[in-house]
């Protein structure tokens, strides 16, 4: 396997190697767009004096939430949308939709058709819900590692909706290059879960540093985004 690529075991004959060097310019452009959109959304939210504060959930809240009867999604959405004016929602929604498109474009660039799989949400299918909640791609580590130290590394994408049918989401799945050398490939994956912002650092050199926990970074409201998250490839 080439040192500047990563290899995926797809449980079939042979492997798929992705050479990242060929994508470096395009990835750089996309990441700049994503960073710009993130800053834009953050600035929009910072200008809202009535933006609700989000406190970390405690264990008691988590337990009681599990046993609490769910209200209809429409009443929840109505309460949340009442916080914002129509103009504010429209602005945030446009920014969020553009950001979402750029994230999909980045994923399609990093992981071609052979790796990305379309996920179709069927609310009656428990397995599909699980896949939507956490999509994991498994890769082999750098071939320079000793055989006994080889491990399967993961890029984990988690999408936190709270209620899958509710039109409220948090900023999802930013994947960026931290560094790339002939022997080390570092990929950062960010996601939000249970009101916390997580970053996973995956190092392709027999080492892995995972999950740096931060406070929630961004919340945006979208009335038009497709939360089935069907990846277009």
UniProtKB/Swiss-Prot annotation:
Residues 196-212 are annotated as: The nascent chain stimulates ribosomal stalling during translation by interfering with the conformation of the peptidyl transferase center (PTC), and the translating mRNA by adopting a difficult-to-decode structure at the ribosome decoding center. Changing residue 204 to A: Decreases propensity to stall ribosomes. Changing residue 209 to A: Decreases propensity to stall ribosomes. Changing residue 200 to A/E/R/Y: Decreases propensity to stall ribosomes. Acts as an endogenous target of the ribosome quality control (RQC) pathway. During translation, the nascent chain has a propensity to stall ribosomes, thereby stimulating activation of the RQC pathway. This is Uncharacterized protein YEL057C. It comes from Saccharomyces cerevisiae (strain ATCC 204508 / S288c). The lineage of its organism: Eukaryota, Fungi, Dikarya, Ascomycota, Saccharomycotina. The gene is SDD1.
